Amino acid sequence: MTTTEKVQPRLKERYRNEIRDSLQQQFGSANVMQIPTVTKVVVNMGIGEAARDAKLINGAVNDLALITGQRPEIRRARKSIAQFKLREGMPIGARVTLRGDRMWEFLDRLTSIALPRIRDFRGLSSKQFDGVGNYTFGLAEQSVFHEIDVDKIDRVRGMDINVVTSATTDDEGRALLRALGFPFKEN
């Protein structure tokens, strides 16, 4: 009988073997628990048109499930807004929270495959940190991910990606994400 050992994600291995030590030296952390790490990644797709056509939410859910490898949560309107023809409880978006190995694999695919496929991409803005080391950015279309078949896209949908870190300052978060391979613009 053979035992199969679990394969660790490539980016997680690199973080544990190289990045963590360099960040500890860079910031002078006395305790290993003070070293910044990625806590979770939240991928959100807002579909405002779903208020008029409920079938649009299915395409977004399928796209998000293919991209992240996890079934998305359908987000519903919390209150009615007459100007948008929106009623409480109507589906208006889909969200996935990634943690653990799925998170590391998604970040690896994002930095090595998806971001380089964006047309006229010159790097991510380094000013989109929230003050405590978390980074949020948006993608204009879902076709940059290789899991999406371009011929089967019913409509172009953008998404917001929020990378939550355990960093306490923007500089720590920026250093962590740069070490993980995020291509920031040089200002």
From Swiss-Prot:
Pfam families from the UniProt entry: Ribosomal_L5, Ribosomal_L5_C
Q: Which UniProt keywords apply?
A: Ribonucleoprotein, Ribosomal protein, RNA-binding, rRNA-binding, tRNA-binding
Q: What does this protein do?
A: This is one of the proteins that bind and probably mediate the attachment of the 5S RNA into the large ribosomal subunit, where it forms part of the central protuberance. In the 70S ribosome it contacts protein S13 of the 30S subunit (bridge B1b), connecting the 2 subunits; this bridge is implicated in subunit movement. Contacts the P site tRNA; the 5S rRNA and some of its associated proteins might help stabilize positioning of ribosome-bound tRNAs.
Instruction: Report the protein name in the record.
Output: Large ribosomal subunit protein uL5
Picking any one GO biological process from the record gives: translation
Family, according to the entry, reads as follows: Belongs to the universal ribosomal protein uL5 family.
> Out of the domains of life, which is the source?
Bacteria
The cross-references to HAMAP family, in alphabetical order and at most eight, read:
Ribosomal_uL5_B
Describe the subunit structure.
Part of the 50S ribosomal subunit; part of the 5S rRNA/L5/L18/L25 subcomplex. Contacts the 5S rRNA and the P site tRNA. Forms a bridge to the 30S subunit in the 70S ribosome.
One Gene Ontology term of the molecular function aspect: tRNA binding
The UniProt entry's GO CC annotations, sorted and at most eight, read: ribonucleoprotein complex; ribosome
Organism field:
Mycolicibacterium paratuberculosis (strain ATCC BAA-968 / K-10)
